[in-house]
Amino acid sequence: MDYKNTLNLPKTSFPMRANLVNKEKAFLKEWEEMDLYNYVLEQRKGKPLFVLHDGPPYANGHIHIGTALNKILKDIVVKYKTMRGYRAPYVPGWDTHGLPIEHRVSQELGDRIKEMSPAEIRKKCEEFALKFVEIQKEEFKRLGVRGDWNNPYITLKPDYEVKILDVFKTLVEQGNVYRSLKPIYWCPRCRTALAEAEIEYHDHRSPSIYVKFRSKDDPNLYIVIWTTTPWTLPANVGIALHPDFEYSVVKVGDERWVIATDLLETFSRETGVDCSEVVEKIRGKDLEGKEFQHPIFEDKTSRVILADYVSLETGTGCVHIAPGHGEEDYVYGHVKYGLPIVSPVDEEGRFTDEAGKYRGMFIEDSNRVIIEDLKEKGILVHASTITHSYPHCWRCKGPVIFRATEQWFISVDHNNLRQRVLEEIDRVKWIPEWGRNRIRSMVEERPDWCISRQRVWGTPIPAVKCKECGEVTLDPKVIEHFMKIVEKEGTNAWFEKDVEELIPDDFRCPKCGARSFEKMLDTLDVWIDSGSSFEYITTREDHPFPLDMYLEGSDQHRGWFHSSIFLAVAKRGSAPYKEVLTHGFIKDELGRKMSKSLGNVVDPMEVVEKYGAEILRLWLASSDYFNDIKISMRIVEQQTEVYKKIRNTFRFLLGNLEDFDPELDRVPYEKLLTIDKWALGRLQEIIKRATEYYDSYEFSKVYNLVVKYCTTELSSLYLDVVKDRLYVEAKDSLYRRSAQTVMHEILIALMKILAPIMTFTMEEVYSHLHEKDRKYKTVQAEYWPEYREDLIDKKIMEDFEKLLSIREDVLKALEEKRQQDVIGHSLDAEVILVPRNDSVKALLEEYRDVLEELFIVSKVSLSDGSGELKGELVEVTAKHAEGEKCQRCWKYTTEISRSEEFPAVCPRCLAVLKGERK
């Protein structure tokens, strides 16, 4: 007789195949139609707020794997916080001013850009930026990221630009903004100043030369310097020695050379010069103020100064000083000693007339010529090349220079700003903790902030220059007047209107009282734009200052986190964030940086269209994102196998709960079967640990916990064990409903735990739940599963640790018999257990009723003899079970039914078939 139709086999419309790409698009459409973002916020009306403030990505191209990682991480945090009961708004933003966009636009326009006005160029830049805002917006939405996509913040919009100017005005009012001729990072290709945050370090080949400067007092005495920038020698005005270092005066032929004693050996090895004859030893301070012949110009001299930054790591301990081309040179040479600032280089990196014979040469090209000239003069000691880490422009990727120009700066020490920022850093929670020291050291060491850019695409600095006396003025009254114009017309007005319209009617030159001005055309560093976002976003509903969290890559310790805290402390008196969470960078599977030249770039949208966004989200959750993360298409594909295991777990749960009404069929805790009580207790432990991991943002631990739970504890243990009860017992029996009650709890809890990560699949699971389990239109509005300690029976949990250890021994014994062809399925077996001691014997006696189910065998008996497999708690012997195989449940029994109505079944199945087993 075929008993298949008498079994309670799983039934579900939840498909085995995910078809993620199409299914995800359907959910995106559904979410759009239901206005998901506002719907979820409405469900948390009146709840406490959690605000993750979005650091704006740059709108100059499609999203890359790094921006995808960042947005998905934020989405996981926001969705988790929502489920924990917070009202968690998320307003995405875009950074839309600045050099990278202007650079791209200038490439597209070519020579035409030379004939265009600043206003026309700005219009093209705006169109370009807004085009990519829309492109990126759709790409982020495709990743399943929930946000206020209809109302993002965009830094080029007038309502945002006004806030940038408002923050800037405060700094001007407080006296933190000044104009000065100082050496700053300068990109000769982009023809603009750069800030620290716009600098990247890459390997670069440079000349490495040793040059001797002749004393004006003693024609045989020389100081030897070392430099990797020969092109800066025309700007030389001094030589720096450390006041306390010992310097040796070495006899070389008829000459005496001054070199730091500790560097003599290295110098001699690198140059081949014999330095063995030391005629005198002196301190650096002994030479202070001495004049030496300029290496390039016969009519100039170079004065010795003292500087404690001089080190003994490389070179000679004698440093050539050019205040026009170096930060320390400026501080020690110009500020401390009053040496002149010489900077004979124009905005394109070519020498000016001041450089004499080198005029018109590009600085890089001049190195070779200058080295030849030094050689001809007989003062070149040695020349070679080195590869070293060197600053490069973030946009064009070319090497930058230090160049002295008139620029606007923010003083980081005026009004004790730096110290106040450091105090605020200590009040913020940094995740990981090392972030605190990283940003602290950057703030402690940073120079004043160069904030002016010689580009048109940015927020203009509303400074004016008096036509009568040449005084350049940056006045809060002018800024405020301009802000009123910006509110209506945007910052383009600065480039479109006459200067008379841009200043108050009663404004006069503070120096000479004249009323005739011209506009200055510098724009603000884009880090001021994005760093002012706290001022704009806190005007939005549900965005109180300070904001709860900033979450970006670890490079933002010197970028957005850095600019934001300086500006917020200046404007509001405190940090703009309570917590800062950082992630690492994405590398290929060999740990290399991604680059087009290596061909190892992974396009997130390619992954999404091939595998689905869910797989990308799962990959991210599997990664320890606090450190650098590896990705390749092979690594992504591995996640598809994990995804299938998780999906199959949910399919099994849904299939076996198809007839379960959570209100009518739920079994109270005290009536649950022992194994089910254990499984429910384990679920509480899973909920507790998952919550702890989410709270500490350790999503990879959530991933590992859930994957192990699904594969090891559910599929291979609990769900395997209860199959017999689910399929074989009477549909409404306590045996079956007890298992279903716990499986229902597992289904709901597991779905909620995974919802922030697997946002699409858990929405699909939610749509297949019993209608009584669906309180909302979306799983994203559900509340987090409650951890209930009262559902953990400590005795059962402790006892099951031992029982599961015994189960491992039983499985080994069964596998041996399977290999010997004694049994096929485990139900073919009988297991004889020999307890190792009385406490184990008592344990097995107590749980005798659950052992057959737990081991999935036909019979378990206890014995005092010895067993074939020696375990820690028991000895195990497995053999083929006696009797005949029940044709319904496949267990062996010696009491097989001979009934004509229900032949060849065991007593349990016979009772079920007759309706006698409840």
Curated annotation (Swiss-Prot):
Pfam families: Anticodon_1, tRNA-synt_1, zf-FPG_IleRS. GO terms for molecular function: aminoacyl-tRNA deacylase activity; ATP binding; isoleucine-tRNA ligase activity; tRNA binding; zinc ion binding. The keyword Nucleotide-binding applies. A motif ('HIGH' region) lies at residues 57-67. A motif ('KMSKS' region) lies at residues 593-597. One of its GO terms (biological process) is isoleucyl-tRNA aminoacylation. The keyword Zinc applies. ATP binds at K596. Gene3D superfamilies: 1.10.730.20, HUPs, Ile-tRNA synthetase CP2 domain-like, Valyl/Leucyl/Isoleucyl-tRNA synthetase, editing domain. It is found in: Cytoplasm. It is an enzyme of class 6 (ligase). Keywords: Aminoacyl-tRNA synthetase, ATP-binding, Cytoplasm, Ligase, Metal-binding, Nucleotide-binding, Protein biosynthesis, Zinc. Zn(2+) binds at C886, C889, C906, C909. HAMAP family: Ile_tRNA_synth_type1. Belongs to the class-I aminoacyl-tRNA synthetase family. IleS type 1 subfamily. Catalyzes the attachment of isoleucine to tRNA(Ile). As IleRS can inadvertently accommodate and process structurally similar amino acids such as valine, to avoid such errors it has two additional distinct tRNA(Ile)-dependent editing activities. One activity is designated as 'pretransfer' editing and involves the hydrolysis of activated Val-AMP. The other activity is designated 'posttransfer' editing and involves deacylation of mischarged Val-tRNA(Ile). PANTHER family: ISOLEUCINE--TRNA LIGASE, MITOCHONDRIAL (PTHR42765:SF1), SOLEUCYL-TRNA SYNTHETASE (PTHR42765). This is Isoleucine--tRNA ligase. It comes from Thermotoga neapolitana (strain ATCC 49049 / DSM 4359 / NBRC 107923 / NS-E). The gene is ileS.
